[in-house]
Design a protein with these regions (language model features):
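A residue-level signal for conserved active-site and pocket-lining positions in enzyme catalytic cores
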Residues: 36, 214, 246
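Beta-rich, aromatic/charged-enriched effector core domains that present basic-aromatic interfaces
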Residues: 22-166
């Protein structure tokens, strides 16, 4: 993708010495570079190592906010103050909804009258009900290449290569997201907490892996899901329940990690 955008790319294999970030920074310095730019990896130890090595080599470091989260570190500082001893998820969730005007009516109140519809997310899955079918992406060049690479370079590692169930391209990821919106979103809220023996998906989105690796951004997922909800009369317990997983939990846990991660280790 980057090459298609005329970006010069140097690919570092996992078995190369430069796959160690400290060794890579040694190489960067030896080639005369005095400035590097990175996205925040949201990794306490990795950030420390990068900063320490850059200081050692007098390399200027410019850290950009990660597009994989809605909040910047500066945004999080308002809620996750060092002086606080306790952080409550519900308080954070409400503040995010208000600040971003997400599912808020013209009077500044939560749509539907409640901040959370968690109590409506606990229905049992109907006996005999067949869950919506998920269209697993077909095996493609990227999956085949990755499997061959893994077999060749990690022969002694545990596990085995089998059916790969996730999208690996932007187009596949968008199609996967659309499939959730069109076929599972409507009843997501009712069966969010349901468990059925021998079923692994039910009405869930399975979007976390795609957001975690950057194939979908949380901002895009939030905006598109809310827009779809309005146009298709998705129940409020489904819309709010889905939004809560991203801005109420994913962002909250990132904030906890950023503020207290080293302490919690």
């Amino acid at each position: 993708y980057l090459k298609s955008q005329d970006v010069k790319v140097s690919y570092i294999n996992s078995y190369d010495n430069e796959s160690n970030i400290l060794t890579l920074l040694d190489t960067v310095k030896s080639k005369g570079f005095n400035l590097i730019e990175i996205y925040d990896p949201v990794d306490y130890l990795l950030n420390r190592r990068i900063k320490r090595k850059c200081n050692e080599h007098n390399i200027d470091l410019l850290v950009h906010d990660s597009p994989q989260f809605l909040n910047s570190n500066e945004d999080l500082e308002d809620f996750f103050k060092e002086s606080k001893k306790k952080f409550f998820q519900t308080s954070f969730y409400k503040s995010e909804r208000k600040r971003r005007s997400i599912l808020i009516d013209s009077d500044g109140r939560p749509e539907g009258g409640e901040w959370t519809y968690d109590i409506l997310n606990r229905k049992k899955y109907p006996k005999g009900e067949i869950p919506p079918k998920i269209d697993i992406p077909k095996e493609n060049k990227y999956i085949k290449d990755s499997q061959s690479y893994t077999d060749e370079n990690f022969k002694e590692n545990y596990g085995k290569m089998g059916l790969f169930n996730y999208p690996v391209t932007f187009d596949e990821s968008e199609k996967w997201f659309n499939d959730f919106l069109e076929n599972r979103f409507m009843m997501f809220g009712d069966y969010e907490d349901a468990i059925v023996k021998e079923e692994i998906t039910l009405n869930h989105s399975i979007l976390s892996p795609l957001m975690n690796v950057g194939l979908l951004s949380p901002r895009h997922v939030i905006n598109k899901s809310i827009d779809f909800s309005k146009k298709n009369n998705i129940p409020i317990n489904s819309t709010e329940g889905f939004v809560r997983q991203i801005i109420g939990w994913r962002e909250f846990i990132r904030g906890i990690y950023t503020a207290k991660g080293s302490y919690e280790r």
